[in-house]
Amino acid sequence: MSDLQTQMDLEQQGVLFTTINKLYNWGRRSSVWPMQFGLACCAIEMIAAAASRYDISRFGSELFRASPRQADVMIVAGTVTKKMVPQVVRLFNQMPEPRYVISMGACATSGGPFRDGYNVVRGVDLYVPVDVYIPGCPPRPEALLHALMTLQAQIDVQSLQQVRWYGDDEGVVNEFPVPIFGAEGLEVPGIPGTADPVGGTPKMPPFVSPALGGKGERDASIKALEGNQPKPMLRAGTVTIEEVAHGIAG
């Protein structure tokens, strides 16, 4: 008699076989509590996913927490402005491990139609690591459910010997630097000058997703935009209408 047949016979008698990893992952995947972080119109679709038509509670994620201390996944839904980034990072640092991030919509992923604006960041992954990206403007509730199932699939294959929050945490970043919003833009500790200037391009690569084995480091395969000058910005009271018209005509 094969081991599989023996296992099936014992299961019919109420004896179940599993591993510590499967049991641990099953418990976590079945109760992924989200922290709502609705920043713009994508949050409406996130709210709709929790309503009766889509019923996100089928996946154990109906408890939207207002406290990061009780949340497992941060759903960043909407446009991330530079004034909001410090709050996003600060709340992410307060979440207990294991913690995950879902970037919902084009704005949270890359800035969306506002990516060239003076006040919008070009992706929340410049400041916190993202596990699952959801395209769309805005994504439908089904897309959020698919992202949740994708996150559950990532949890299913995790091993306690390899996850970054269990065991030896050497080299693992647990506290991400909280940016400071200054007069010229976002200043990130550890990055000289203004890391994300107002009206300019960020001078830093995104973080590596933990799903890809990241430990909180930035993606070295993407070249940082060193020396990139910010685009000229019109400040109130510094130019005249004639100067603006001359610039457009030129």
UniProtKB/Swiss-Prot annotation:
GO terms for cellular component: plasma membrane; respiratory chain complex I. [4Fe-4S] cluster binds at residues 41-42, 107, 137. It comes from the Bacteria. Its cofactor is [4Fe-4S] cluster. The keyword Transport applies. It is a peripheral membrane protein. Signal peptide: none annotated. Its EC number is 7.1.1.-. GO terms for molecular function: 4 iron, 4 sulfur cluster binding; iron ion binding; NADH dehydrogenase (ubiquinone) activity; NADH:ubiquinone reductase (non-electrogenic) activity; quinone binding. Keywords: 4Fe-4S, Cell membrane, Iron, Iron-sulfur, Membrane, Metal-binding, NAD, Quinone, Translocase, Transport, Ubiquinone. It is found in: Cell membrane. InterPro entries: NADH_UbQ_OxRdtase-like_20kDa (IPR006137), NADH_UQ_OxRdtase_20Kd_su (IPR006138). SUPFAM superfamilies: HydA/Nqo6-like. Binds 1 [4Fe-4S] cluster. GO terms for biological process: aerobic respiration; electron transport coupled proton transport. It catalyses: a quinone + NADH + 5 H(+)(in) = a quinol + NAD(+) + 4 H(+)(out). NDH-1 shuttles electrons from NADH, via FMN and iron-sulfur (Fe-S) centers, to quinones in the respiratory chain. The immediate electron acceptor for the enzyme in this species is believed to be ubiquinone. Couples the redox reaction to proton translocation (for every two electrons transferred, four hydrogen ions are translocated across the cytoplasmic membrane), and thus conserves the redox energy in a proton gradient. Belongs to the complex I 20 kDa subunit family. NDH-1 is composed of 14 different subunits. Subunits NuoB, C, D, E, F, and G constitute the peripheral sector of the complex. NCBIfam families: nuoB_fam, PRK06411.1, PRK14819.1. This is NADH-quinone oxidoreductase subunit B 2. It comes from Herpetosiphon aurantiacus (strain ATCC 23779 / DSM 785 / 114-95). The gene is nuoB2.
